[in-house]
């Protein structure tokens, strides 16, 4: 894959290999749902991460009680929310990567997360992790710095009204 495209937001783009078109419909998939479905149903909650790696890291921490699934990007939609609600989910926590690097981008990113969650608040209770203290590096996932850091951020998450 072209490094320029990866560095500039193209890593989730469809690929053409020997004239064949390959794509993965991200808007219809939650990575890790097949493994974490029982824990999600038992706890009535799902934690949405951006990347598959986050779901795998959480699996190492929580094992059979892991409720983390990945949206494979920084968006989710009504289809995915309804899929979780059908499993009995009442609480959805968005745990996306830290994408703010200054006060202006912090406000923009906060508003983006808040409005994404608010859009679907009639389906479930929504909250999101937002690192106001810059504990995480820029573009780092809440799972990248260990379970203690994740749980600290989780306990300080923003609840959407």
Where on the chain are the PLM-derived regions?
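TOPRIM fold recognition
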Residues: 44, 56-161
């Amino acid at each position: 894959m072209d490094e320029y495209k990866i560095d500039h937001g193209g890593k989730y783009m469809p690929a053409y290999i020997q004239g064949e078109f390959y794509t993965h419909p991200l808007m219809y998939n939650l990575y890790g749902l097949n493994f974490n479905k029982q824990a999600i149903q038992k706890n009535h909650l799902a934690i949405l991460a951006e990347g598959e790696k986050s779901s795998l890291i959480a699996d190492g921490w929580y094992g059979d009680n892991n409720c983390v699934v990945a949206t494979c990007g920084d968006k989710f939609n009504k289809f995915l929310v309804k899929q979780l609600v059908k499993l009995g989910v009442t609480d959805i926590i968005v745990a996306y990567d830290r994408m703010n690097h200054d006060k202006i981008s912090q406000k923009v990113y906060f508003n983006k997360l808040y409005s994404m969650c608010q859009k679907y608040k009639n389906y479930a209770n929504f909250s999101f992790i937002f690192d106001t203290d810059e504990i995480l590096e820029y573009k780092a996932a809440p799972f990248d710095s260990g379970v203690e850091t994740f749980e600290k951020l989780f306990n300080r998450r923003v609840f959407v009204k």
